[in-house]
Amino acid sequence: MSLPIAGLAQLSKGIIQVVGKDATKFLNGLITSRMLPNVVKKKQHTISENENRHANLSEIIDINNNWGLMHGDIYDPEENIFIGRDGLNSMFLNSKGRVTADCFLYSFPFHNSKGSFEEVLKKPNFLIEVDSRIIPEMESLLRIHKLSAKVKINTVSDIYSYYYYSDTMEFDELLEQVQDTYFRSVDPNEALVKANEFIESNLIFNSRVSSNIVGFSIDNRIPNLGIKILTNKPLNNDDQNIGVAVDDFFSESFQQSFRTNIISEDVINMRRNVNGLFEGQDADIDQTLLPFECNLDYTNGLSLDKGCYVGQELTIRTYNNGVIRKRIMPVQFFENNEETVDEISNQGYVNIDSSDKVVETLKMLNQTTLGKLDMLPLYDLPVENEESKSASPFASSPFGGESKKSRRRKASSGKIISQHDNVGFALVTLSEIERNDLFKIEVPSLEGGMRSVGIKVFTPDWWPEQEDY
């Protein structure tokens, strides 16, 4: 099965607005991304030369104004920090350092072309985009932490979330051009000017519908994966009378170069799965995960020098100790037979196939049941007893027989987080992947007894170069 080369999909996301004088400081204490301009280190001498370049950020950024967002990457050797109106990836954690929700955070409004949002720009204003299933819980969480902070928190029902991608070299080059030209600002005033220029450039959007674009972000969780768009009206095909027609939304030049057909959200989710980009919505709501297990450090969602926030202690300690034992990785399920094993052993990418026979086998199990099954190495070889290796006279059995080879009970190598058709995500022990990428689970068979289903784990090619597991 091949995915469409390009398309636009509406996402099942909900939006919460946080607005007010203390909005920046309030959110800085709750999310994993840096919001405040000052560098926080326990010891002054640990501030690097690159970080010193940004020492005057507190003079440039007035957090009491609608200033935008700071963008950084912990894997950037130059430790660049840019200020922009575009959105960023982040997470909310609980006090134990476990993920409450992943999110995209947007500076609202994205632009003020033609003075469309003059009134909104008068105070700090942010939009939080999360899985629509958890909107009530997220709004409650924000209100619990509000205390005396001067902010207003509201769920917004008339803002719509969209995702566009095009798997072409030309689109990748366009996004590079857009980022280099419009999203490399170093102060808030320039950031707003550049956002206005981008909207008016017609590179992607038709400037005539600028008043309908309230949020924008290049999705750099994986470099140039796509773009995220927030609108105040729904987008639709020409034959519908509500909202904005897609043909009117994108510029004429953009439509001449790229397809802009509407696709389903399922396509976006499957494309994420193929590329190994996990989101919280992929797992059961009650699933508890750590931010590093969700690869937050790989997807530009973590700051290491932002100071205190909920869940910080375990997160920073884990990073500094360098002990990350498990990560969520893309997997493909397959029929466990000799022919299929030989074929998939040499397969270097996730291949979606809804007609695969293994899909019927997996249909018998719900998500919760799958998550409880142990992932074990596909090849479970006999392991010789330690006693038989010893030269000690006590190595032999006291009952006169020779020591026998036994099978050491294998600990689970991981667990299934999600499954759709023949692909999914699994939380995998990294040390296992170094030795082997083929695993199995035992599932009930219609004929009675148990049946083995194979699993291949793929390491995404966009991950930073790995140290030894």
From Swiss-Prot:
GO terms for biological process: iron-sulfur cluster assembly. Keywords: Mitochondrion, Transit peptide. InterPro entries: TrmE/GcvT_dom1, YgfZ/GcvT, YgfZ/GcvT_CS. Residues 1-43 form a transit peptide. The keyword Cell membrane does not apply. One of its GO terms (molecular function) is transferase activity. It comes from the Eukaryota. Residues 390-401 have a biased composition (Low complexity). One of its GO terms (cellular component) is mitochondrial matrix. It is found in: Mitochondrion matrix. Residues 387-415 are annotated as: Disordered. Belongs to the GcvT family. CAF17/IBA57 subfamily. NCBIfam families: ygfZ_signature (TIGR03317). This is Iron-sulfur cluster assembly factor IBA57 homolog, mitochondrial. It comes from Scheffersomyces stipitis (strain ATCC 58785 / CBS 6054 / NBRC 10063 / NRRL Y-11545). The lineage of its organism: Eukaryota, Fungi, Dikarya, Ascomycota, Saccharomycotina.
